[in-house]
């Protein structure tokens, strides 16, 4: 229990992630047990910065990992359409995100969760941001959502 409290304290006090702006939201603040809801992460790369999209070979594409927890079944993560970016020095095309986009994660809340439970869903947004000259160190940014079971 102490570990969980410490983890939540770190998540809630984490500094903003570098090179992007990130906002977490849910499709509903309350959900019936057994119902699937959507968890969103809205990401806006800084000007002149891109993050790699799924399908980028030899690069670290953006990904969302939901921490395991009893009563939470993690569904599919949906990505928007990426942009094709041509990297001149290597003469290659790479899928990236350069403008605001939304990640859409499905989850289902079930047993042992019950009506009245307030659930914090914790996750980590993994990404690597780059500009035209340099790729920055990979980042694992904590993200969380609060949902009440009704």
Where are these regions (language model features)?
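Sec-dependent N-terminal signal peptides
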Residues: 1-10
